[in-house]
Amino acid sequence: MSSFDSAEGECNGLNQHYEKKVRPIIDLVDTLRALGVEKDLNLPAIAVIGDQSSGKSSVLEALSGVALPRGIGIVTRCPLILKLKKITRDKNWSGLLTYKDQTEILKEPTGIENAVLKAQIALAGTGEGISHEMITLEIQSCDVPDLTLIDLPGIARVATGNQPEDIEKQIKDLIEKFIKRQETISLVVVPANIDIATTEALKMASTVDPTGQRTLCILTKPDLVDRGMEDTVVRTVNNEVIRLEKGYMIVKCRGQQDINDKLNLVEALEKERRFFDEHPQFSSLLEDGKATIPLLGQRLTEELVEHIAKNVPRLQNQIEMKLQKTFERLKVLGESVPDDDEIELNNFLIKKLRQFMDALEEVKRVEEEPVKSDTRVFSKIRQEFVSWKHILDSKPIKMSTDLQEYVRTHRGKELPGFLNYGTFAGIIRMHVEDLEEPALKLLRNAKDIVHSSVGSIANIHFNGYPNLLLAVKEPIEKCLHEQFQNAEEKIRSQFKLEKTVYCQDDLYTNHLNLLRPKNTVRFGLEASLGNSELRETAFHLTSYLTIACERLANQIPLIVQYHMMNEYNSQLQNAMLGLIGTSDPGMLLCEDSGVARIRKDLKERLERLKDARRALPKVVHSANSW
């Protein structure tokens, strides 16, 4: 009987107490990982890391009960997902190794080492490099805890032999990819006979997890600790040297001499127990439940289950968010192009163009989505209208200063304080002319906004159809240019009209009466114009210019909106309809190969996430009761 079953409260207790709760929770993550969901989500996991020769492989061997590749240099060359499933003693041991599209059924533990080596060569080549491709090893045995671990390559300090020169960076990048995730617990393996502060693995874990909330450290090789250093090891395991929230444990695995002596793993566990039980200093660690492989297995199972349970709500939210984003991306890409049937191709083309025109119509109706800033039109043009109004509002304010300057430079035979109609009209025309260029600038800005928005909408709807996108670009540009010219002509005509001084008598009189009693100080008329006749003229000029500005404040935006949005939209929709029947739909709908691949990937992701969503409720109850 192995040490996993030897003590009450260790394996048997684990099996009885957690059987109904542990396995469903761990199986959930294993199921999601098997579905390939790890491509889309960060799944809760325990990642095993350590420097080379830290004893990492020996720990995994002891936990799994099988011999894994070991030796000098980089032994783990690919991430190895080690799934340990505890079964009852009436069932036979079984193993299953999978990588890429390969599957190997293993009936004996002795075949594990060669099978893993073969998989590593297939993924990482015959040299000494590494690969990010994963190998999955599932072991069902009565001598293992319920546990899933991810074994990562040991950290190499310098490249040796056929290793790439940047092998240290490659390994650290791979390790960091896993341990930086909030969903990952780092199981850091460190030899007990060295200064733990100098180990790269613990430094890396501390960098991404400064408080140690996701880090559990395992000390190995306690039999190699120098005499007199035992108390330091005890203090380390008791979390008194470098503090970690999850703390430390210590184990003694098979050494090379044990392997040479053909000491099997079951015997090694019994030898480990005796070592700690009889050690003068380390026996206290065993009493505290901080030593031996069986207790480590129980601790890791508890940590993993608790970690998964804690992350279930986050996992649910991630799945829903990813599903929503995937749905949206597929909606943008649309359906795949039908086969060469001409009727179906025409119908598909009509559908794509109709969707584009509907999007333009939404812009015209000012039904804009706040999150899509690239396609918003009216809200941006409205800001231009506001700026235009500010320019107009500032005109009457400057009237007193402008009037004095104009009189000084243009006065002829008129008596002081008297201005004839020609002078009055000249001042009005001067102010109106000043406003023409800002109005045209408003039009140009509106054109740029519409051009950018329609271009973005076209890119969204015709992304992946380069020929169709090119075909619609021409009418987009042509129609916009025509409507811009029409609007420009109307604006120039409007300013020509404004140079003719005219206003209805009652409207003009009302403005004049409103101005006199209230706004002399506001417009600076009292202070700057001492001459009463000149001041009266200023009242008239200010009143008329206010009326003219009110006309322009509405008229220019109406012209811009009518041509840049309404007419342009109608003309462009007619041009889109003109593409139907006049062009080869097969040629227009020739799809970019990259888009077809993206659509295929998105559909596969959608199915993975749907499967994950269906699987998740099965464990929510167990997770909530943990």
From Swiss-Prot:
The organism's taxonomic lineage, starting at the top: Eukaryota, Metazoa, Chordata, Craniata, Vertebrata
Compartment(s) of residence: Cytoplasm
Keyword Nucleotide-binding: yes
Residue ranges annotated for the GED domain, each copy included: 534-624
Keywords from the UniProt entry: Cytoplasm, GTP-binding, Nucleotide-binding
Protein family according to the UniProt entry: Belongs to the TRAFAC class dynamin-like GTPase superfamily. Dynamin/Fzo/YdjA family.
Name assigned to this protein: Interferon-induced GTP-binding protein MxC
SMART domains: DYNc, GED
GO MF term set: GTP binding; GTPase activity; microtubule binding
Residues engaged in binding GTP: 50-57, 151-155, 220-223
